[in-house]
Amino acid sequence: MKVLLISPNSLTTPYPVYPLGLDYVADAIRAEHEVRIADINPLGDLEALGRTIERYAPDVVGISLRNIDNTDKLDPSGFMGDYRACVNTVRKHSPAPLVLGGSGFTLFPEEIMTDLRAEYGVVGEGERLGPLLTAIEAGSRDISGIPGILTSEMPHRGVKPLDRTFALNYLCARSQLVYYLKNGGMLNLQTKRGCPFRCIYCTYPRIEGRRLRRVPPEMAAERALRLEEAGAKYFFVTDSAFNADYDHSARVAEAFIKAGVSIPWGAFFAPTTPPDGYYQNLAKAGLSHVEFGTESLSDQMLTVYGKPFRAHHVLKAHEHALAAGLYAAHYFLLGGPGEDEQTVEETLSRISELKKSVFFFFALCVSIRIRRCMIWPLNRVRYNAGRVF
């Protein structure tokens, strides 16, 4: 069958993000089906997408929904309207069944299925699409035995993440990369999936599971080298936390060096205390900056958030990164359950100890006024059985 995979993500702030997930999906089904990717960023608009659909005449159309909103209170924007417009374009130009997927879809599958009225949805990792395509091609209407697949008639059930290592043996066409190489020059790479941490707000475990599935370091290095050869000026490791496994991440860095990767890269890190020399070795491998998921410098709030570290670990991790000559950034999340003036004051008063750093603040709760800070509405938080979603 002819399968068209669409990335409707037009968000370009702070930079356009290459739709890596669709490459994984395309690679998983390419042996059995003809696959094409349509990315709205290089296409430019929905009219161009419509022309692409008519020329290709797909048998199945998949749309990957990456983001639900931009989490920016100063310039808030939701994307469901854009997704509706994308679906309308697909329906206008093709009678093919529509399959929804992606990280944003996985968080709210039933609501989005109802809103966008698709025939099918893929919850979790998109590589699950293969068995669904087989069923569609065979004309089967019974998909109840396919994990992670839902329809508007079949209610969503809990889905376990795929229990296997994901492939890295694809190389996207140069034509797909041109837009991103011209607009920032950054591409992306995964060295593992899953997250073992239990932060109460995080979506990674829900999408990828808690068990780490590691790419062999040599394979990760080969992929990084191919990104460089394709023209990337920089790449970002999209793991939940690159240092969630210190040993594996150190071996990945060693493999980068052996493979001759020469462009800089960055990644997300948990501010836990690293082994001696860890950040120095990563810097030698090209790491230019670390992005710490710190969230708070109040031990009380770190406990509430389910973080595997405390404030003194944050300071120590920051010192190690600076000592290695790296740039550092910290993300903070204000307004979690139990946040009050005292806990915010703890965070704000200790920030000065994080020298030479950039800080990004996000808010969680609704209009809570406290001294020196206003926590505005940003994300809707649902409380259910003591959990935060």
Spans of model-derived segments:
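Flexible glycine/acidic-rich beta-alpha junction loops that bind and position SAM and/or redox cofactors
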Residues: T12-T13, N67-K73, P109-E110, F197, ...
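Conserved beta-strand positions
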Residues: I63, V123, V237-D239, F292, ...
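Acidic, low-complexity intrinsically disordered segments
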Residues: M1-L225, E229-A230
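Short helix-capping segments at alpha-helix termini
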Residues: R91-A96, G139-R141, I257-S262, A324-G325, ...
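Residues at alpha-helix caps and immediate loop-helix transition turns in enzyme cores, especially N-
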Residues: V17-Y18, A48-L49, D75, F79-D82, ...
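Structural recognition of alpha->loop->beta junctions
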Residues: E111-P131, K284-H289, E346-F362
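Radical SAM [4Fe-4S] cluster-binding motif and immediate context
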Residues: F166-A329, L334, S349
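Structural beta-sheet core signal
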Residues: L5, I63, L100, A267, ...
